[in-house]
């Protein structure tokens, strides 16, 4: 530890990022209660102004939106990152009666860190003793689902996915929604707890929720549900602190990150992860091989199964919800990458490839896969089977190495399912648009509809600094085709470690991609927010336009650059067209004119009817005697 690190006592000094705890404008946190009082599902309610009288003068119902920000945006909750978030799930876990509290950490490395006095000032101060399944028990959501049990977590996500859809319909918020094309997905008109159970039992969806992460607000990942996004955080050997990483977490979930992966490779990985998990209302994923490599000083050849196993237990006892495991990088696939333009670009993939070549043995993650499953089901950690041979350039897309590994991931998925362990599959990468659907179709075929989770894909390689856009295009497409979760890409991709601004930009970009995919799939209720914003735009309700958007701050700032006065917030134009050329203002004038013409036409028509009736009453004679 440096002198500066020794001087910092995080258990005394750590503070929440103040930007992350500000409520959104005109929004309030609401909770929808389930069948028991401790099932309280958070949503964000956006209140709207009334329609102006010259547009018909009506009341606009508030709009509910999916909320990943946890208690951070609830003004009634006091946030103290030194203590962590409130417990959401322990009562549910206790009621199932299949877990036990350990006397302490059981991993060797975890005990070593706990006993290191020098780390006391960096350590999260309120560490609980971990839980583990009782001997012979399986505590995975898939295991419960296959036994016909609807857990509290399943009910929770059903409420969360529905977003009070019936009430929205009754309020007239869904008068219009285009039919979608779901490419064979089975999206119901309403998400029920029983449907959630069926999808998890089938392996088509997962609820990543480690029994040691009771703070998590359950969410679901699957092709028949809302498309989710993941945001990556984590330190490197070159920088960032624990406090900065917690700030990135809270900032990311504010803008809509459904899960967060901690990809730390620098100092104090164990301590950083503890702070992140204790303060996270969303599932946390990791790549355990990164930390295992740090334990052998970065020498891949020195990795051994026993050390990796201890790392899995260490992280499972902290509460990691899903592990990226690169078990599909087999020895026979490595030579297939030799002629690639960019070779092996996955960090985990390159580590395992190097180990395989150095020992000329099969990947130990593959040979010990059943043992990994035993660990996963003891804590309900989900697999995210890593695509270690994903293409790192569009030139390498859909090659033999990539698809060979995908076939192996399908084989491993079926092994995980035999253990009732939840599983999703990671995907590319860099893929031109015309090859994206082939990726999705092959994944569905090889992995039997297990959820797909892709990094983009990036559709072109020519735009360093703008890869959030090159990948957002591919993300929207593959989300439409059936991908369940999209891993965000920031503007710093390939260039450097992202900061807070980069995190926000990446998340907003991917929220757009995910929502566009939901619309295209025809997810029930997906168009509610679009309809509300379009109506506000036509009625020149500027504040409602800002507040209904994914990023109210930026929308308001852009508007105010040229029209900063409050009077401009009720003006019937913006600076793009000005008062005389606003298409929506002109359209309204045309409507008013048409209404007047229609009124004249009605008067004329009534007069003609009266004359016709008089003609008939007078005998229908063309001429009358004078």
Swiss-Prot record:
<feature type="binding site">
    <location>
        <begin position="387"/>
        <end position="390"/>
    </location>
    <ligand>
        <name>substrate</name>
    </ligand>
</feature>
<comment type="pathway">
    <text>Cofactor biosynthesis; thiamine diphosphate biosynthesis.</text>
</comment>
<keyword id="KW-0411">Iron-sulfur</keyword>
<feature type="binding site">
    <location>
        <position position="426"/>
    </location>
    <ligand>
        <name>substrate</name>
    </ligand>
</feature>
<keyword id="KW-0004">4Fe-4S</keyword>
<feature type="binding site">
    <location>
        <position position="582"/>
    </location>
    <ligand>
        <name>[4Fe-4S] cluster</name>
    </ligand>
</feature>
<feature type="binding site">
    <location>
        <position position="261"/>
    </location>
    <ligand>
        <name>substrate</name>
    </ligand>
</feature>
<dbReference type="Pfam" id="PF01964">
    <property type="entry name" value="ThiC_Rad_SAM"/>
</dbReference>
<feature type="region of interest" description="Disordered">
    <location>
        <begin position="1"/>
        <end position="22"/>
    </location>
</feature>
<feature type="binding site">
    <location>
        <position position="326"/>
    </location>
    <ligand>
        <name>substrate</name>
    </ligand>
</feature>
<dbReference type="GO" id="GO:0051539">
    <property type="term" value="F:4 iron, 4 sulfur cluster binding"/>
</dbReference>
<dbReference type="GO" id="GO:0016830">
    <property type="term" value="F:carbon-carbon lyase activity"/>
</dbReference>
<dbReference type="GO" id="GO:0009229">
    <property type="term" value="P:thiamine diphosphate biosynthetic process"/>
</dbReference>
<comment type="function">
    <text>Catalyzes the synthesis of the hydroxymethylpyrimidine phosphate (HMP-P) moiety of thiamine from aminoimidazole ribotide (AIR) in a radical S-adenosyl-L-methionine (SAM)-dependent reaction.</text>
</comment>
<feature type="binding site">
    <location>
        <position position="494"/>
    </location>
    <ligand>
        <name>Zn(2+)</name>
    </ligand>
</feature>
<keyword id="KW-0862">Zinc</keyword>
<dbReference type="Pfam" id="PF13667">
    <property type="entry name" value="ThiC-associated"/>
</dbReference>
<comment type="subunit">
    <text>Homodimer.</text>
</comment>
<feature type="binding site">
    <location>
        <position position="453"/>
    </location>
    <ligand>
        <name>substrate</name>
    </ligand>
</feature>
<dbReference type="GO" id="GO:0009228">
    <property type="term" value="P:thiamine biosynthetic process"/>
</dbReference>
<feature type="binding site">
    <location>
        <begin position="346"/>
        <end position="348"/>
    </location>
    <ligand>
        <name>substrate</name>
    </ligand>
</feature>
<protein>
    <recommendedName>
        <fullName>Phosphomethylpyrimidine synthase</fullName>
        <ecNumber>4.1.99.17</ecNumber>
    </recommendedName>
</protein>
<keyword id="KW-0456">Lyase</keyword>
<feature type="binding site">
    <location>
        <position position="577"/>
    </location>
    <ligand>
        <name>[4Fe-4S] cluster</name>
    </ligand>
</feature>
<keyword id="KW-0479">Metal-binding</keyword>
<feature type="binding site">
    <location>
        <position position="574"/>
    </location>
    <ligand>
        <name>[4Fe-4S] cluster</name>
    </ligand>
</feature>
<feature type="binding site">
    <location>
        <position position="290"/>
    </location>
    <ligand>
        <name>substrate</name>
    </ligand>
</feature>
<dbReference type="GO" id="GO:0008270">
    <property type="term" value="F:zinc ion binding"/>
</dbReference>
<dbReference type="InterPro" id="IPR038521">
    <property type="entry name" value="ThiC/Bza_core_dom"/>
</dbReference>
<dbReference type="InterPro" id="IPR002817">
    <property type="entry name" value="ThiC/BzaA/B"/>
</dbReference>
<keyword id="KW-0949">S-adenosyl-L-methionine</keyword>
<feature type="binding site">
    <location>
        <position position="430"/>
    </location>
    <ligand>
        <name>Zn(2+)</name>
    </ligand>
</feature>
<feature type="compositionally biased region" description="Polar residues">
    <location>
        <begin position="10"/>
        <end position="22"/>
    </location>
</feature>
<dbReference type="InterPro" id="IPR037509">
    <property type="entry name" value="ThiC"/>
</dbReference>
<comment type="similarity">
    <text>Belongs to the ThiC family.</text>
</comment>
<keyword id="KW-0784">Thiamine biosynthesis</keyword>
<dbReference type="GO" id="GO:0005829">
    <property type="term" value="C:cytosol"/>
</dbReference>
<feature type="binding site">
    <location>
        <position position="232"/>
    </location>
    <ligand>
        <name>substrate</name>
    </ligand>
</feature>
<dbReference type="InterPro" id="IPR025747">
    <property type="entry name" value="ThiC-associated_dom"/>
</dbReference>
<keyword id="KW-0408">Iron</keyword>
């Amino acid at each position: 530890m440096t002198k500066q690190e020794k001087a910092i006592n995080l258990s005394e000094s750590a503070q929440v990022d103040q930007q992350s705890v500000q409520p959104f404008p005109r929004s309030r946190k609401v909770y929808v209660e389930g069948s028991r009082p401790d099932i309280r599902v958070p949503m964000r309610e956006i209140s709207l102004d009334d329609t102006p009288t010259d547009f018909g003068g009506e009341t606009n119902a508030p709009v509910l939106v999916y909320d990943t920000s946890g208690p951070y945006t609830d003004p009634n909750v006091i946030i103290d990152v030194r203590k962590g978030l409130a417990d959401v799930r322990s009562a549910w876990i206790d009621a199932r009666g299949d877990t036990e509290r350990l006397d302490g950490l059981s991993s060797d490395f975890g005990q070593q860190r706990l006993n290191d006095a020098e780390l006391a000032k960096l350590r999260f101060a309120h560490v609980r003793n971990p839980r583990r399944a009782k001997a012979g028990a399986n505590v995975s959501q898939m295991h419960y689902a296959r036994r016909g049990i609807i857990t509290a977590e399943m009910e929770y996500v059903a409420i969360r996915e529905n977003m009070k859809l019936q009430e929205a319909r009754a309020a007239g918020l869904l008068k219009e929604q285009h039919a979608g094309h779901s490419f064979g997905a089975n999206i119901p008109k309403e998400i029920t707890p029983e449907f959630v159970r069926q999808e998890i039992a089938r392996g088509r969806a997962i609820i990543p929720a480690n029994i040691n992460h009771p703070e998590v607000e359950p969410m679901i990942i699957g092709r028949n549900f809302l498309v989710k996004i993941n945001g990556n955080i984590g330190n490197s050997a070159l920088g960032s602190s624990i406090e900065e990483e917690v700030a990135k977490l809270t900032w990311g979930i504010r803008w809509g990150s459904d899960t967060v992966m901690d990809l730390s490779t620098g100092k104090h990985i164990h301590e950083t992860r503890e702070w992140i998990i204790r303060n996270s209302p969303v599932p946390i994923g990791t790549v355990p091989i990164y930390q295992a490599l740090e334990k052998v000083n970065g020498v891949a050849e020195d990795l051994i199964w026993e050390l990796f196993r201890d790392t899995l237990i260490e992280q499972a006892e902290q509460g990691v919800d899903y592990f990226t495991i690169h078990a599909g990088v087999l020895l026979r696939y490595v030579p297939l990458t030799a002629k690639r333009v960019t070779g092996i670009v996955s960090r985990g993939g390159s580590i395992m490839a190097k180990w395989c070549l150095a020992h000329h043995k099969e990947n130990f993650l593959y040979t010990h896969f059943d043992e990994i499953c035993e660990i996963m089901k003891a804590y309900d950690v989900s697999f995210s089977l890593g695509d270690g041979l994903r293409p790192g350039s569009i030139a390498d897309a859909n090659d033999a190495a990539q698809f060979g590994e995908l076939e192996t991931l399908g084989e491993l998925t079926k092994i995980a399912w035999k253990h009732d362990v939840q599983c999703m599959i990671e995907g590319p990468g860099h893929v031109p648009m015309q090859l994206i659907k082939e990726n999705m179709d092959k994944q569905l075929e090889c992995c039997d509809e297990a959820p797909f989770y892709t990094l983009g894909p990036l559709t072109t390689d020519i735009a360093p600094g703008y890869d959030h856009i090159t990948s957002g295009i591919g993300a929207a497409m593959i989300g439409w085709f059936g991908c369940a979760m999209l891993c965000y890409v920031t503007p710093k991709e390939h260039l450097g470690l992202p900061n807070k601004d980069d995190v926000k930009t990446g998340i907003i970009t991917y929220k757009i991609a995910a929502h566009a995919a939901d619309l295209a799939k025809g997810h029930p209720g997906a168009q509610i927010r679009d309809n509300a914003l379009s109506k506000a735009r036509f009625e020149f309700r500027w504040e409602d336009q800002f507040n209904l958007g994914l990023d109210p701050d930026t929308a308001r700032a852009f508007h105010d650059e040229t029209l900063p006065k409050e009077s401009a917030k009720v003006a019937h134009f913006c600076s793009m067209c000005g008062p005389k050329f606003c298409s929506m203002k002109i359209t309204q004038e045309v409507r008013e004119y048409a209404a007047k013409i229609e009124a004249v036409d009605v008067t004329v028509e009534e007069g003609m009817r009266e004359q016709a009736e008089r003609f008939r009453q007078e005998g229908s004679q063309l001429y009358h005697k004078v």
